[in-house]
A protein has these predicted regions:
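A glycine- and charged-residue-rich anion-binding loop/surface
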Residues: 1-237
Length: 237
């Protein structure tokens, strides 16, 4: 093996042999066992002879739908592939979350969902998509998974509406937010700064609905970091 990406762990073995009393003392268990954990999609990678989870047939069909909607080619550019994979992963996760009763919001699990959808929308923007499109991928996600998760089909229209509404809401602010982000970024760079202020990150969140991890990703693309501690403090005020 190596520390590179050449190999993927398909499963692992956990040897349950000792009991930890919480104070650093270990004693042997009377009953020992070996626990095996295996990732289903990682197993599919090995069985199908593909390079990654994103190349497994059921996942690739979702990516193919994304490429059809965006016009982007998969496998030609690392940067493009990252965006396609982010969109594929996030819309799949979002579909299941909404089916399970989660709605986009600014707190708790609803905020996780909002962050997923808005990050995916931003990557669509990077691929040149200027209008809502994620909702059109929902049907493919459902088609690939309804055999084992039949309730997805029952809630298909509802899931699609939720995704489309969230996309449309973000679309109203993303262009203005990107413009302000560019201006704020230029100000930091003009001063030779490498840290994007928490106050500016909060402004993007509070005014334009940019989740902190979305801002952090955009800042990282520019070789900078975000003062997330200052952002968190402003969130608490």
């Amino acid at each position: 093996g190596c520390d590179c990406d050449r190999y993927m762990e398909v499963w692992n073995n956990v040897f349950s042999q000792f009991d930890n009393d919480g104070h650093g003392h270990y004693s042997e268990l009377a009953q020992k066992n070996i626990d095996t954990g295996m990732g289903l999609e990682r197993l599919a990678v090995a069985c199908q002879g593909v390079e990654s989870l994103f190349d497994v047939d059921t996942v690739m069909n979702i990516t193919n739908r994304v490429t059809a909607l965006t016009g982007a080619a998969y496998g030609q550019s690392h940067k493009t592939d990252v965006s396609l994979r982010v969109i594929t992963d996030h819309i799949r996760s979002a579909t299941f979350m909404i089916a399970d009763g989660v709605l986009p919001s600014n707190e708790g699990r609803g905020y996780v969902l909002r962050r997923l959808l808005r990050r995916a929308a931003r990557h669509g923007k990077l691929l040149g998509v200027d209008k809502p499109f994620l909702f059109q991928v929902v049907e493919t996600v459902i088609h690939e998974n309804e055999g084992h998760y039949g309730y997805l089909r029952d809630r298909a229209d509802y899931i699609t509406r939720v995704v489309r509404t969230e996309e449309e809401n973000f679309a109203r602010t993303i262009d203005g937010g990107m413009k302000i982000f560019a201006e704020l970024l230029a100000e930091h760079k003009a001063k030779g700064e490498t840290v994007f202020s928490g106050a500016d990150a909060f402004k993007l969140y509070d005014t334009y609905g940019f989740p902190i991890d979305l801002t952090a990703e955009m800042v990282e693309d520019e070789g900078m970091t975000v003062d997330e501690a200052a952002f968190a403090k402003l969130m608490q005020e």
